[in-house]
């Protein structure tokens, strides 16, 4: 049986977040959360938040043993981008792209 959690429009870069998600994939929940807490970055806190939400979903269904959960899949998709402009010299402007991410986590029991 699976437990899922989804976070949309998170203000972190999908490209950088995927590097962290690759480290967590296929690990047990306790080990994954321990690793994310040691990193302490914004991306790590956001992924840990989604993992904790998936664990809470598993507990609420009541059919899963929380100690035997592992990260079956974690998917980082690109959300909508926010476009901003930064003034430059001689009346010009550069475009700043602020990226967002959609994070989907699926946990499964061993």
Predicted feature locations:
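C-terminal structural segments of small proteins and small subunits
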Residues: 81-99, 103
């Amino acid at each position: 049986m699976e437990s899922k959690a989804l976070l949309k429009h998170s203000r972190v870069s999908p490209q950088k977040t995927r590097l962290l998600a690759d480290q967590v994939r296929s690990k047990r929940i306790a080990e994954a959360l321990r690793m994310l807490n040691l990193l302490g970055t914004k991306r790590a806190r956001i992924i840990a938040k989604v993992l904790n939400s998936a664990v809470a979903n598993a507990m609420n269904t009541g059919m899963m043993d929380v100690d035997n959960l592992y990260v079956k899949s974690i998917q980082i998709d690109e959300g909508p981008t926010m476009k901003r402009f930064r003034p430059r010299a001689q009346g010009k402007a550069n475009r700043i792209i602020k990226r967002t991410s959609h994070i989907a986590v699926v946990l499964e029991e061993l």
